[in-house]
A protein has these predicted regions:
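Mg2+/Mn2+-dependent nuclease catalytic core
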Residues: 107-211
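Metal-dependent nuclease catalytic cores that hydrolyze phosphodiester bonds in DNA/RNA
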Residues: 1-128, 233, 237, 248-260
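Hydrophobic/aromatic-lined pockets within catalytic cores
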Residues: 59-63, 143-146, 174, 221
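Metal-dependent nuclease catalytic regions and adjoining charged, substrate-binding loops involved
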Residues: 45, 168-270
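Detector for Asparagine
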Residues: 7, 14, 73, 81, ...
Length: 270
């Protein structure tokens, strides 16, 4: 299957290829990831994703993809009188801030929405890069709530697994071109005032992240193919597990609100 802008996110493409997002899903909750692929579960995406997609399109999309996005999402972005909703207005201001930053625009000046495919441990992967400059860099645009991590023991790059994204993108580009390129994040926040940053993920972290992908991707593929039963994560922030849970017995009050990892640690399973 030849991937294009039109079919990149199609059910067939998602069935044939892993993406970084799909890998993250299987690592977080295999049952949720499997249900999404089979069509049994459709994740609800709020305005955060819509706004992120809007900023991404306006800064790295093609003219054709921008017009398509605006047409499909016009009523969610703009009021009946044509004025943008408040959060969209803030996103527009952020886009202008980014365009006035030479360093940010340097890393957003490559070829946009470049698709490549490859394999990791024999498993097909697909990537679509926000900004790719042959022989120089790979860059991805992020529109974040802020640059602080929800986890005190991880920085925001590690928390959101951007290292996995950088590692996979760099490896697939290497397979296609023979070049190992640096990976950058071009970051703008939703804060007032907006915080801006250009971040390079270092080689050590990218290599470590690629090792993580290599160690886990075959199991993820086996789950995807139905060869291994997909486990439920039962984490509090997993909408799929919350919506499909069947209670079997009371739990101890000390366990209420704890993460699965915390409960396993208490039981000595970790």
């Amino acid at each position: 299957m030849k991937l294009t802008q039109a079919n990149y996110y199609s059910k067939e493409a998602n069935s044939l290829y892993f993406s970084v997002s799909q890998f993250k899903d299987f690592m977080k909750c295999p049952a949720m990831a499997y249900a999404k692929l089979s069509g049994e579960y459709e994740e609800e995406y709020g305005r955060a994703l819509l706004l992120g997609s809007y900023v991404d399109e306006m800064l790295t999309g093609t003219r054709k993809s921008q017009m398509k996005f605006l047409e499909e999402n016009h009523s969610d972005l703009f009021k009946k009188n044509g004025e943008p909703y408040a959060d969209v207005g803030q996103a527009i201001d952020t886009i202008e801030r980014v365009r006035k930053q030479p360093l940010m625009m340097k890393y957003l000046s490559g070829k946009h929405q470049v698709i490549m495919t490859g394999e990791i441990e024999g498993v097909p992967f697909k990537i679509k890069m926000d900004s790719y400059k042959e022989g120089e860099y790979i860059a991805d645009l992020k529109y974040l709530r802020d640059t602080r991590s929800p986890n005190l023991f991880q920085n925001v790059v590690d928390y959101w697994k951007y290292t996995w994204q950088g590692a996979v993108y760099r490896e697939i580009v290497r397979q296609n071109t023979g070049e190992t390129l640096p990976f950058y994040l071009v970051i703008a926040t939703k804060e007032k005032p907006v915080h801006l940053a250009v971040v390079e993920i270092n080689d050590f972290n990218l290599n470590e992240a690629l090792d993580t992908v290599k160690k886990n991707i075959r199991r993820c593929q086996a789950i995807k193919e139905g060869k291994i039963e997909p486990e439920r994560c039962e984490e509090h922030d997993c909408s799929y597990c919350a919506e499909t849970v069947i209670l079997k017995e009371p739990i101890d009050s000390d366990l209420l609100g704890m993460s699965t990892a915390q409960i396993k640690a208490m039981k000595g399973d970790i």
